[in-house]
Amino acid sequence: MSEIADWQPSASIANLLKKAKIVSNIRRFFADRGVLEVETPMMSQATVTDIHLCPFETQFVGPGASQGLKLYLMTSPEYHMKRLLAANSGPIYQMGRCFRNEEAGRYHNPEFTMLEWYRPCFDMYRLMNEVDDLLQEVLDCEASESLSYQQAFLRYLDIDPLSADKEKLREVAAKLDLSNIADTEENRDTLLQLLFVSGVEPHIGLEKPTFIYHFPASQASLAEISSEDHRVAERFEVYFKGVELANGFRELTDAKEQRLRFERDNRQRVAMGLPEQPIDERFLAALEAGLPECSGVALGVDRLIMLALGVERISDVIAFPVYRA
């Protein structure tokens, strides 16, 4: 008889049945709003340049690639979905597998389900409202509240994140007993992220979902810079019961600016001893052809269902997490 004891799913069959129903309801939510479901590749010849993301790599050795064609498992379907938008797809969503060669734990699995959708003609606030509608439907929770990134820092840390210098940020870190990390950190955004995780996140989204919006422009990623305040980006995140659920943008449409951001990311990667990543030229070509003004958001489905079912770990809603795969 086999000595392997962990062959069974980590999630109960009852939870998997509830998960299937929630997934079905999510699809109905978008069908009722006329949003097209799409499928895009799970592998690509290019990948993200983000210094915080680590993709899985593989090789295709089939016909036409005898020397091996390097491919990356997708950390997000974003680039391919924006190529569809540039081809006049209209509003689209996708619920599929993504892969990140990073953490595995209470809220993380290297293979996970992402819900991502894009809304032409939506500004950031209108998309935030739609995310709120979905959360209320799936979680049966109260309507959300919203705080700007600046308001959140002022409320919980009594510091303005848009103007404070690194020395001031280190002073606040010391009050949170984080000097051992902050005193040697030279990157201002890393210091801000340290303070946000330790001094802001524990206070937000406890009773109702909380949107944090207008992140510093230096953390724009693929978001537009605000036309009203060039210190901030049109970017938001959503938190509920200690869990980061979603990350959204009013999407950057300028191909030249996007290339500059990718190149800046790669310079940072090299400085940090990380591999330089290939830039997705097809994605940039789509931006050059014309990405419509739009907003988009990526939401972690496993985390959402974990909250909906009131369980403690995403392994309670995934049949076979990485250590049982």
From Swiss-Prot:
ATP binds at R100, N101, E102, N109, E244, L245, G300. InterPro entries: Aa-tRNA-synt_II, aa-tRNA-synth_II, aa-tRNA-synth_II/BPL/LPL, EpmA, Lys-tRNA-synth_II_C. One of its GO terms (cellular component) is cytosol. The keyword Kinase does not apply. Its EC number is 6.3.2.-. Substrate binds at S76, P77, E78, Y118, E251. It comes from the Bacteria. It catalyses: D-beta-lysine + L-lysyl-[protein] + ATP = N(6)-((3R)-3,6-diaminohexanoyl)-L-lysyl-[protein] + AMP + diphosphate + H(+). Keywords: ATP-binding, Ligase, Nucleotide-binding. One of its GO terms (molecular function) is tRNA binding. GO terms for biological process: lysyl-tRNA aminoacylation. With EpmB is involved in the beta-lysylation step of the post-translational modification of translation elongation factor P (EF-P). Catalyzes the ATP-dependent activation of (R)-beta-lysine produced by EpmB, forming a lysyl-adenylate, from which the beta-lysyl moiety is then transferred to the epsilon-amino group of a conserved specific lysine residue in EF-P. NCBIfam families: genX, PRK09350.1. Homodimer. HAMAP family: EF_P_modif_A. Belongs to the class-II aminoacyl-tRNA synthetase family. EpmA subfamily. This is Elongation factor P--(R)-beta-lysine ligase. It comes from Proteus mirabilis (strain HI4320). The lineage of its organism: Bacteria, Pseudomonadati, Pseudomonadota, Gammaproteobacteria, Enterobacterales.
